[in-house]
């Protein structure tokens, strides 16, 4: 509901749905994420959304994944046990090393010339995660630093993943 509130405050027309016909009308589908990768993928399968999201990505219709939603965009995750993901962005999700949780504010270092992301340089964003993306460099748009460097924004075409929570990051989000 934080994402919905944030988007409505910015005057976006927001609909929450798992109906493919409703999602197809959307300019952008946002995959939020709180919870565990295996149960989230099970929910997507149970709601018959996996095939739809894969097809939407093939057609280059925008999808934004936030936190766990970003992780679901990948080929799979080692959270609890290996679970296959949507496979929209090559790479996997692995546990953070010590410390095992990253909760707090960090800046983004951009690796690509993305104008929207470039506007976010030197601003802090809110993170709350215990897993990170591990994959080819060409899909890493921004990195952040917490003991070690990790990807904080990934993307392939019109599929974008944000490890941070823009809706909890105040004005920069």
Annotate each predicted stretch with a short phrase:
Residues 75-148:
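Pocket-forming structural segment of enzyme catalytic cores
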Residues 33-34, 68, 130, 164-166:
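Glycine-rich His-Gly loop
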Residues 23, 118-119, 154:
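Short, flexible hinge/linker loops that cap or flank conserved catalytic cores
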Residues 67, 71-73:
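Glycine-rich nucleophile elbow surrounding the catalytic serine of serine-hydrolase chemistry
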Residues 132-173:
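C-terminal and late-domain segments of enzyme folds
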Residues 1-62, 68, 92-94, 172:
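N-terminal beta1-alpha1 cap of cysteine-dependent amidohydrolase-like domains
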């Amino acid at each position: 509901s934080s994402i919905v509130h944030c988007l409505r405050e910015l005057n976006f027309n927001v609909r929450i749905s798992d109906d493919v016909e409703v999602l197809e009308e959307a300019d952008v589908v946002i995959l939020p994420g709180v919870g565990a990768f295996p149960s989230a993928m099970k929910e997507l399968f149970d709601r018959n959304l996996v095939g739809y999201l894969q097809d939407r990505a093939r057609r280059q219709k925008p999808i934004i994944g936030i936190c766990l939603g970003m992780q679901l965009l990948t080929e799979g995750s080692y959270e609890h046990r290996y679970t296959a993901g949507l496979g929209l962005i090559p790479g996997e999700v692995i546990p953070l090393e010590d410390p095992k949780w990253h909760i707090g504010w960090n800046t983004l270092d951009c690796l690509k010339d993305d104008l929207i992301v470039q506007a976010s340089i030197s601003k802090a964003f809110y993170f709350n995660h215990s897993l990170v993306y591990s994959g080819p460099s060409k899909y890493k748009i921004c990195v952040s630093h917490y003991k070690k460097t990790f990807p904080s924004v990934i993307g392939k075409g019109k599929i974008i993943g944000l490890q941070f929570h823009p809706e909890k990051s105040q004005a920069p989000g």
